[in-house]
UniProtKB/Swiss-Prot annotation:
Record-annotated membrane-spanning stretches: none
EC class (word): ligase
EC numbers: 6.1.1.19
GO molecular function, one term: ATP binding
Renumbered ranges of motif 'HIGH' region: 121-131
UniProt protein name: Arginine--tRNA ligase
Length: 563
């Protein structure tokens, strides 16, 4: 039962002048729980009813009579609703126990496709913490939309094309070793790439040699293509090892190269629609009517196509292939102008679905307040970071629970979960400063804190040998259990809000609040004592663990049963 809708229905029945949706938008959550669970301000009725809001509130209170409310009070211009704790706790616990991990599952998406462009590292470049944000935000959004009944397609749009491959081919032919590349693909390819960039300062002829090899690659030269494919395959194998560590997979690895033969169609379509203009020898699309000052550069004066041309081809291909309801691009804030241009050009081409393209931007990860940069050597690589997080998690588990049987597997779940959760708890439009010690802490607003709350509840349930029954009428009416019940009941709404705002941090913050509320309850309540409320308290514990586990799962974080 949705409290807000119930209250809106009650008020609409006695105030026909107000629509239910209007009332819903006016409902507020009181700052103090002693003031009720929800409040309706009557200011908007003063004009039509020609009375002071305080009088309106007093008169309306007397007309509301529903067993769903413990009491309804007029406090000044507000009508404060106190929900019936016993009745609602029984309903909520029954629903969670019955549905288990399917609690909060919805059919909003009706099976429609959502395409998510995420991660997208560059071939032959190391996978750093900077790449993590797009990867974990995109994966969490995929889980969230699936929970709401959408089908999702996760596309890893690899950076697998460009002039740097000419450089890489020259570098490999001069200094490369097949054995070394096979042993450590990313490290070795990066080493020779850095070397050739340094060498070109004193040997500019290497630059021309690299351009020549890239021309060969564009013209499907057999040797150039074979080397490019090998670099790509070796790099992808390395990336997939890291993705497996993170517990993340993809539906497509179609990267930049995939669209090489699809860009000319875009240029032709733009020409046919009369959208191309010449500017200093280049072909551009004017976007001033969309409030975009700079035109979209489609083709350079030398005939080379550009990044936006490739993205236009990708968007059109994805619409044709997946018929998406939404196409989400999880890409940093620095690309905001690019995606505005992309949407505007698609709109100019007459594609009504351009409105379904969504740039989900995010802030930077810094270290000690400094921007991370591969070129400057100020970079945090993901693989050693995961290893260190797992090591630190294992040390804490050794202290807390030295006899834990599968502690290495648990430490991996905690270490990886800590890194992902710390990223996802931050509002995505904000950046955060990388702090591994804070990430893996079992205290504070962290992934391990939430995981530990879940493991603690599982321990309680094992001790009690408790098996919840959906047919039982579990009821609670104390203040601390009520805070937990309200949070659990709000979980479905939280998921919808997270999807509407493309904001996984709402799920992470929810999980933190639920874990905190349960820990407070646990500190003040003897759950296992023999009392009339024992089974209801255990049912509440079970429901909390179920929802915590599901919230973590939406973020791509495991919830160990023991820690």
């Amino acid at each position: 039962m949705n409290h807000n809708r119930l209250i809106a229905k009650e008020i609409a029945a006695i105030v026909p002048a107000l629509e239910q949706e209007t009332i819903l938008n006016l409902l507020e959550k009181p700052k103090k729980s002693s003031m009720g669970d929800l409040a309706f301000p009557t200011f908007s009725l003063a004009k039509t009813m020609r009375k002071a809001p305080q009088i309106i509130a007093s008169e309306l209170v007397g007309q509301i009579n529903n067993s769903y409310f413990e009491k309804v009070e007029a406090v000044g211009p507000y009508i404060n609703f106190f929900l019936n704790k016993s009745e609602i706790s029984a309903q909520v616990l029954k629903e969670v126990i019955k549905k288990r991990e399917d609690y909060a599952q919805a059919a909003i998406g009706q099976g429609h496709n959502i395409v998510i462009d995420l991660s997208s590292p560059n071939i032959a470049k190391p996978f750093s913490i900077g790449h993590l944000r797009s990867t974990v935000i995109g994966d969490a959004l995929s889980n969230i939309f699936q929970k709401l009944g959408y089908e999702t397609v996760k596309i890893n749009h690899l950076g697998d094309w460009g002039k740097q491959f000419g450089m890489l081919i020259v570098a490999y032919k001069k200094w490369g070793s097949e054995e070394a590349v096979r042993a450590h693909p990313i490290d070795e390819l990066l080493k020779i790439y850095v070397r050739i960039n340094a060498e070109t300062k004193n040997h500019p002829e290497l630059d021309e040699e690299a351009r020549e090899w890239f021309r060969k690659l564009e013209n499907n030269d057999e040797e150039a293509l074979a080397l490019w494919q090998w670099f790509r395959d070796e790099s992808l194998m390395e990336f997939n090892r890291l993705y497996a560590e993170l517990g993340i997979d993809f539906d497509s690895y179609n990267g930049e190269a995939f669209y090489n033969d699809k860009m000319e169609e875009v240029v032709q379509l733009l020409a046919e629609k009369g959208l191309l203009e010449e500017s200093k020898g280049a072909q551009v699309v004017n976007l001033e009517k969309y409030g975009i000052e700079h035109p979209a550069l489609i083709k350079k004066s030398d005939g080379a196509t550009l990044y936006i041309t490739r993205d236009l081809a990708a968007a059109i291909y994805r619409k044709r292939t997946y018929d998406f309801a939404k196409a989400i691009y999880v890409v940093g804030q620095e690309q905001t102008a690019h995606f505005k241009q992309l949407k505007a050009v698609l709109a100019e081409m007459g594609y009504a679905w351009s409105k379904d393209i969504q740039h989900v931007s995010f802030g930077l990860v810094t270290k000690n307040g400094q921007k991370l940069s591969t070129r400057k050597g100020n970079v945090i690589l993901l693989e050693p970071t995961i290893a260190e997080a797992v090591k630190r998690s294992l040390a804490q588990i050794d202290t807390k629970n030295p006899d834990l049987v599968n502690k290495e597997a648990v430490a991996h779940a905690v270490g990886v979960g800590a890194i992902k959760f710390y990223d996802l708890k931050t509002d995505r439009t904000n950046g955060y400063d990388f702090d591994l010690e804070a990430m893996v802490s079992f205290e504070g607003e962290t992934g391990p804190y939430v995981q530990y709350a879940h493991a603690r509840i599982q321990s309680i349930l094992r001790k009690a040998d408790f098996q919840p029954q959906a047919t039982e009428n579990y009821q609670l009416n104390d203040t601390e259990s009520w805070e937990i019940i309200k949070l659990i009941q709000d979980f479905p709404n939280t998921i919808v809000r997270a999807a509407d705002n493309f904001e996984p941090s709402l799920i992470a913050r929810f999980a933190i609040h639920l874990a905190q509320s349960f820990n407070k309850y646990y500190a003040h309540t003897r759950i296992l004592d023999n009392s009339p409320e024992r089974d209801s308290r255990l049912a509440l514990s079970y429901a909390t663990a179920t929802v915590l586990k599901e919230a973590l799962a939406l973020l791509g974080v495991e919830a160990p049963n023991e820690m």
